[in-house]
């Protein structure tokens, strides 16, 4: 089969590799579509823990079950499925196990024509989604659903701020918030992305590159009951100032690194909660799929590339030009 293969840091090729085989408890899925995440770019750039080359990246995928291994229900054969990229979560809902990993490293990922995965990580493809939309759903849907519902305990009367709108998780979080009946606001350095977020249901937004943006946003729309952030860095104290007393800040990344200082007194005096969130459990995945099907939500797909042009898909994500998920089709 053909697959995207990272032979070393910044060495991406389309390679011919052996077809995967389903061992006991596994299935082989012929992929109809896959999608990129920032994680794939960080692996390509050598900026991810536990690097192993060569590897096939990709955490998101949807396709048709082609074969099953020993012990797997044969009724999976021929079924349209999406893949839960959260592997070996473990028995606790509160946090993942030590054996937890994400599909696409160290296990071979979805940027290929076929993939072998545990049967326990399959779910029926939501019937209202096209293949490209279904492939765009797993990681962003799982991550955003857990951080909003399991961690932040989102309520319909909440006012929520999402920082850095445009990526898959942030955009799907916006869709979940709007569907739940809560009020969403966004930040971006792009007026176009803010405008497109408003078209999806956001109540407003702010350009975080503008001087005093946090003060202006607070006066116009704040404070916020929930703030969703994946950046961290030196602007983190602005988020503390924007949070309502008793509010929750949920972090699912730290792309700008650690802040040099944190306003701890404001956190304890105003009864704020700082919450971390990573991926999600099988229960979170099932809950996300139920919510998506009930509200007929569709992930935003920014652009679709054939597998042969995967390098262009990676380049688009590296420069941050996407609004929504970047999809690759074999």
Describe the role of every protein-language-model region.
Residues 2-4, 221, 296-300, 311-330:
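C-terminal capping/lid region of NAD(P)-dependent oxidoreductase domains
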Residues 18-34, 47-90, 106-109, 126-128:
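Glycine-rich beta-strand-centered segment in the early N-terminal region that forms part
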Residues 75-76, 154, 243:
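Short, well-ordered loop/turn sites that connect or cap secondary structure elements
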Residues 79-80, 114, 159, 179, ...:
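Residue-level marker of beta-strand positions
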Residues 85-164:
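NAD(P)H dinucleotide-binding glycine-rich loop of Rossmann-like/cofactor-binding domains
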Residues 99, 180, 188, 231-300, ...:
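Glycine-rich phosphate-binding loop and adjacent beta-alpha segment
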Residues 143, 168-169, 234:
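Hydrophobic/small residue at the entry helix of a nucleotide-binding pocket
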Residues 162-165, 178-235:
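Adenosine-nucleotide cofactor-binding segment
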């Amino acid at each position: 089969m053909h697959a995207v293969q990272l032979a070393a840091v910044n060495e991406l090729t389309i390679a011919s590799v052996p077809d995967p085989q389903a061992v006991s408890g596994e299935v082989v899925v012929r992929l109809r579509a896959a999608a990129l995440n920032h994680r794939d770019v960080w692996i390509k750039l050598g900026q991810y823990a536990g690097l192993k080359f060569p590897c096939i990246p990709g955490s998101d995928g949807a396709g048709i079950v082609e074969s099953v291994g020993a012990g797997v229900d044969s009724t999976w054969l021929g079924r349209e499925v999406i893949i839960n990229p959260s592997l070996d979560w473990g028995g606790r809902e509160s946090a993942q196990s030590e054996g937890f990993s994400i599909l696409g490293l160290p296990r071979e990922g979805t940027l290929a024509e076929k993939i072998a995965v545990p049967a326990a990580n399959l779910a029926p493809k939501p019937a209202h989604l096209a293949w490209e939309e279904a492939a765009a759903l797993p990681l962003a849907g799982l991550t955003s659903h857990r951080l909003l519902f399991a961690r932040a305990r989102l309520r319909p009367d909440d006012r929520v701020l999402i920082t850095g709108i445009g990526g898959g998780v942030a955009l799907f979080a916006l869709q979940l918030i709007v569907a739940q009946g809560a009020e969403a606001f966004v930040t971006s350095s792009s007026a176009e992305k803010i405008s497109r977020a408003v078209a999806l249901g956001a109540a407003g937004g702010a350009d975080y590159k503008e001087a005093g943006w946090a003060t202006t946003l607070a006066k116009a729309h704040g404070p916020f009951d929930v703030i969703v952030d994946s950046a961290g860095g030196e602007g983190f104290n602005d988020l503390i100032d924007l949070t309502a007393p008793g509010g929750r800040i949920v972090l699912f990344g730290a792309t700008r690194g650690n802040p040099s200082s944190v306003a701890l007194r404001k956190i304890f005096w105003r009864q704020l909660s700082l919450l971390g969130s990573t991926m999600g459990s099988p229960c979170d995945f099932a809950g996300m799929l139920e919510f998506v099907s009930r509200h007929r939500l569709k992930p935003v797909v920014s652009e679709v590339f054939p597998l042969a042009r995967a390098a262009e898909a990676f380049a688009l994500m590296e420069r941050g030009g996407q609004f929504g998920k970047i999809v690759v089709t074999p």
